[in-house]
Amino acid sequence: MAVKLYRIAWQRYSAHIRTADAALVAQLGRFLDLKPGIEETEPPGAVENLITIEESDGAYRIATSDWQLRAGNRGQLLFAALEAVGQIFVYEFSGAIFHAGAFLRGNSATLFFGAPQSGKSTLGFSAWRRGLPLIGDDRVVLMDEGRRVRPFPKCVKLRLPVG
């Protein structure tokens, strides 16, 4: 398969993905509810928002200008690629991003803040199971001087209870 350059855009921000794995890019688009496009040429400054994904002998390498990691299977690859896209968006975004979750109840959003592994995803999942729309479980954005809450792209991570 030929290596192509894809663009995933959110609001006015974009991440570019260089890969031969069109199925992965389509899966990322479905997961993020964003439509990937193909770029004919690399845009100026794309190195700052470029993710390179390569496969060799069943293992995957995911790299940005700041970091790289390896994935041993397709499931790990999807979550590593989602994390890379999220990191690109975090780097470019100038709004008020919080390490928090939020769900919608009527006309209001309820935000819940917490340290990593403190139960934000579990609380969000519980709210969703009760019919409350989940806005986000790990990163949310306050906009319009706090009058609007929006999700910030990052994959949901549910952890099994210990014990």
Where are the regions a protein language model picked out?
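A noncatalytic interaction/capping subdomain that flanks phosphate/NTP-handling catalytic cores
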Residues: 1-116, 129-130, 140-163
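Conserved glycine(s) of the Walker
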Residues: 118-120
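A conserved segment at the C-terminal end of the G1
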Residues: 122-132
